[in-house]
Amino acid sequence: MLYDAIIMSVKVISVVDDMFFASKIRAVAEAVGKEMSFPRSLEAVVSKARETKPGLIVVDLHNQRIDPVVLARELKSNEDLRDIRLLGFFSHVQTDLKTSALSAGFDEVIPRSVFARDLQEILTAD
């Protein structure tokens, strides 16, 4: 699983427009000393990734502002950004989102419930 991989950077980008999950991610990140950013457009995510070189980008595959498939293709086609780990989470009943995300270049896609349960472990894996 992704969170078994080495995530050395203290910087994480979160592409989440659900206020509940954004709040939960922010609280856990602060508790474990991770620097979080929450860009709200495709251009802002790419720009922030170039600027900060995060160890991880977490993406809500149900995001209404940013198409996760387009985001993954953009990041993975860029030589400077392709090594950033992409973790997507989704409603377990929408397996088509999982398939699309993995095909687009996500490193791992997990159900939303697993993401919520394992968030601290995901952010502190090393």
What does each of the following model-derived ranges do?
Residues 83-92:
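A short, hydrophobic beta-strand element within the central beta-sheet of small alpha/beta folds
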Residues 59-75:
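Conserved phosphotransfer microenvironments
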Residues 33-40:
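Short hydrophobic/Thr-rich beta-strand motif most characteristic of the beta2 strand and flanking loop
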Residues 10-19:
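Conserved acidic segment of CheY-like receiver
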Residues 76-81:
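Conserved phosphotransfer cores of two-component systems
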Residues 105-117:
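Output/docking surface of receiver
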